[in-house]
Curated annotation (Swiss-Prot):
Residues 1-23 form the signal peptide. The modification Phosphoserine is found at residue 334. Cell surface receptor that transfers passive humoral immunity from the mother to the newborn. Binds to the Fc region of monomeric immunoglobulin gamma and mediates its selective uptake from milk. IgG in the milk is bound at the apical surface of the intestinal epithelium. The resultant FcRn-IgG complexes are transcytosed across the intestinal epithelium and IgG is released from FcRn into blood or tissue fluids. Throughout life, contributes to effective humoral immunity by recycling IgG and extending its half-life in the circulation. (Microbial infection) Acts as an uncoating receptor for a panel of echoviruses including Echovirus 5, 6, 7, 9, 11, 13, 25 and 29. One of its GO terms (molecular function) is beta-2-microglobulin binding. FcRn complex consists of two subunits: p51, and p14 which is equivalent to beta-2-microglobulin. It forms an MHC class I-like heterodimer. Interacts with albumin/ALB; this interaction regulates ALB homeostasis. It is a single-pass type I membrane protein. This is IgG receptor FcRn large subunit p51. It is found in: Cell membrane; Endosome membrane. CDD domains: IgC1_MHC-like_FcRn. Keywords: Cell membrane, Disulfide bond, Endosome, Glycoprotein, IgG-binding protein, Immunoglobulin domain, Membrane, Phosphoprotein, Receptor, Signal, Transmembrane, Transmembrane helix. Residues 202-289 form the Ig-like C1-type domain. Residues 322-365 are cytoplasmic. The gene is FCGRT. Residues 111-200 are annotated as: Alpha-2.
Amino acid sequence: MGVPRPQPWALGLLLFLLPGSLGAESHLSLLYHLTAVSSPAPGTPAFWVSGWLGPQQYLSYNSLRGEAEPCGAWVWENQVSWYWEKETTDLRIKEKLFLEAFKALGGKGPYTLQGLLGCELGPDNTSVPTAKFALNGEEFMNFDLKQGTWGGDWPEALAISQRWQQQDKAANKELTFLLFSCPHRLREHLERGRGNLEWKEPPSMRLKARPSSPGFSVLTCSAFSFYPPELQLRFLRNGLAAGTGQGDFGPNSDGSFHASSSLTVKSGDEHHYCCIVQHAGLAQPLRVELESPAKSSVLVVGIVIGVLLLTAAAVGGALLWRRMRSGLPAPWISLRGDDTGVLLPTPGEAQDADLKDVNVIPATA
């Protein structure tokens, strides 16, 4: 079968559908979403991974950084010291396998290879493994637990399987991970950080206006750094529903989410509007008033001060580096949470809402 060109929207849809019974309603699943591209854009990773515990992202990795790092509330999980080193080692092996697959496919690309690997604990505490793969947005291969190898109907599946079989004990490592390592990790996470599954972070909100076409302005209601991802935004005019605008939604590198909704109104009428936000982290719906120009000026001053503080921090970092090179101990340890990889969506469904006057931000990007 021929291989179609990559369709980014299809890739996201595929990984939304693949989990099956491992939906967001279950908090007892551990899933790794792996993606590799044969022709990455300059400055972007060729391979990246997001790890999910139930509906929450707990891990990120990409080939530029080369280290597995915790996300969201899992940054504070009381894990054993070697845990993240083990995650890093395993994902570097996966990175090598995925990039080797492109050699087996030849140079006809571009190709996008994705994998969904993990396990779910059933009611009787037994583990149900998942190991499926997609090429350019179409599922084409899985890992057969009985045969202990990869297989599929496409010739590309045979080519990749043969290539991976040549790697040192790759099939045995895959089998061991699915049947033993994955359920063990899942049980450890549930034991050490079950409270993190109830993590709720309320959004920081802002409502701003900017000029649009002659005689009109655009109101933008923005929500920052919230979790869980389900969120409702709606506009009111003098207390009455004002319809919905154009929405935007996406994940942050720390496991939280951001969203916004924009509405076009008549110039001079902006002060009649407000934004209402509903979220699990809020005790009640929050009313967000239009930000005044004076407040915006204060924000600009704050940004300038922030830049100055970052500059000072950079100078301090240079001094710290020199201190460490000279053999002196470091006075602190800093956690880094950047991620240049594109995060894949979590399985789940959006919260129901009245679409006539509510802008619903879905649980999947």
